[in-house]
């Protein structure tokens, strides 16, 4: 029996969003870039893994740059011009991702580090000995 033709869902409507917020989460293993509007609704996102990198290569600065470029490209299609950048995490892709957003054509108005720091909360895990 033939399968019925697959109906594609509604396409995401193109919205004109002139300014927003870029959230960069940079860990040692991956970098995730989410670009939202000022209310926090996600407009575009990308990660090193979604950009085609696997394993240890996801943690590299080049992977972060590629992910940021992909997210910025989609945000520019939605009409975004200015962004604030919120960076979270200790990873190596922090600066490269910010630079990639700037080179892509987005005007950066603010850069803020929002890495959570404990005020002596939970006990740290034991030190790794290699």
Curated annotation (Swiss-Prot):
Organism: Synechococcus sp. (strain CC9311)
SUPFAM superfamilies for the chain: Translational machinery components (SSF53137)
The protein, known as: Small ribosomal subunit protein uS11
Encoding gene per record: rpsK
Pfam families linked: Ribosomal_S11 (PF00411)
CC terms in the record's Gene Ontology section: ribonucleoprotein complex; ribosome
Gene Ontology biological-process entries: translation
Function: Located on the platform of the 30S subunit, it bridges several disparate RNA helices of the 16S rRNA. Forms part of the Shine-Dalgarno cleft in the 70S ribosome.
Similarity comment: Belongs to the universal ribosomal protein uS11 family.
UniProt subunit comment: Part of the 30S ribosomal subunit. Interacts with proteins S7 and S18. Binds to IF-3.
Entry keyword Ribonucleoprotein: yes
This protein's UniProt keywords: Ribonucleoprotein, Ribosomal protein, RNA-binding, rRNA-binding
UniProt GO MF annotations: rRNA binding; structural constituent of ribosome
């Amino acid at each position: 029996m033939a399968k019925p033709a697959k109906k594609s869902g509604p396409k995401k409507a193109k919205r004109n969003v002139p300014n927003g917020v870029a959230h960069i989460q940079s860990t040692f293993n991956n970098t995730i870039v989410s670009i939202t509007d000022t209310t926090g609704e996600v407009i575009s996102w990308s990660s090193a893994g979604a950009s085609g990198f696997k394993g240890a290569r996801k943690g590299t600065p080049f992977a972060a740059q590629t992910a940021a470029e992909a997210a910025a490209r989609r945000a520019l299609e939605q009409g975004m011009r200015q962004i604030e950048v919120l960076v979270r995490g200790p990873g190596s892709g922090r600066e490269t991702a910010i630079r990639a957003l700037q080179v892509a054509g987005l005007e950066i108005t603010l850069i803020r580090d929002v890495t959570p720091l404990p005020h002596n909360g939970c006990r740290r895990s034991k030190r790794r000995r290699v």
